[in-house]
Amino acid sequence: MKKNVSYLTAKTLALCFSAQAQLNPAQPLSSAPPYSLFEQWAQPVAPFQMFPHVYYVGTRNLSSVLLSTPEGLILIDAALDASAPTIRAHIEALGFNIKDLRYIINSHARLDQAGGIARMKAWSGAKVVASAANAKQLALGGKQDFALGDALSFPPVKADIIVGEGDSVTLGGLRLTALMTPGHLPGATSWLTTLHQGGRSYRLVYADSLATPDYYLINNKNYPSLVADIRGSFLSLAQQQADIFIANKGTRFDLENKMLRLQAGDLDAFVDRQGLQQYVQQSQQTFEAQLKQQQNKM
């Protein structure tokens, strides 16, 4: 039976925020993308309703999704620290009150998904929800990243609720369930929920990154299970049936074209029953080619 998570025990807190393991000095790190790339991704777009009770409040390529319920709001991801004022303004432009935000859900703890969480939490008083590994990285502000070291830090923030596989957060009749999809980061988490509209049920999948950009895949001393983890995540996400597929980067779920279709009057523009499988297949092909290339160099 899936556990409904409503609080974080003192014991769990102690386990999650104990002393952090240092990175292995013998393991080379990957080159971090330039911050200018994130700034390009953070260009503004107007907020809009994607589907009843589901709103896009993020940037051009950094997803931030707001879910509304009779008991308050849930936010998934918060882009860059510099994006936080924009996300807040988007929420308020849609007619919502930032103080009604109850939960901030994290997919993975890097600056482009988690950078704005600290400010969003401070403004709203919402509880931050993350996997144990993500919670450690959130507390470190992204430092000691297994692939990037301290290159892309962000304002640290404490997680209030720790989730594992199959755990869920419930608010106002809406249940969000965690699907562990490690590989991009050890704590990477996708999120599942079911929406009800017009007498029908729609399965929404918010998929985390499946990318391994410039990672050292073979015998990575900072993340020995990387290859097994990402392959397991391909399998886990491929087994999901999504009516509405959202990813934490807009390009991964064709955000721009779907926005245009919505603006043209297609109210089902974000209903996409093939998108998740295509995303997984493309990601897996890219990964296997990257792995083969590294194996050939050995």
Where are these regions (language model features)?
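Active-site HxH/HxHxD metal-binding segment of metal-dependent hydrolases
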Residues: V54, A82-P85, E92-S168, V271
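Metallo-beta-lactamase
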Residues: N24-P34, Q43-P44, Q49-F51, L73, L80-A82, D100, K158, S168-L171, ...
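Conserved beta-strand hairpin/beta-sheet module of binuclear metal-dependent hydrolase folds
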Residues: Q40-L94, I98, S190-T212
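Divalent metal-coordination and catalytic microenvironments
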Residues: H53, L67, D77, H108, ...
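Bacterial N-terminal signal peptides
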Residues: T9-S18
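Boundary at the C-terminal end of the N-terminal hydrophobic targeting segment
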Residues: A19-L23
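C-terminal regulatory/interaction regions
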Residues: R273-M298
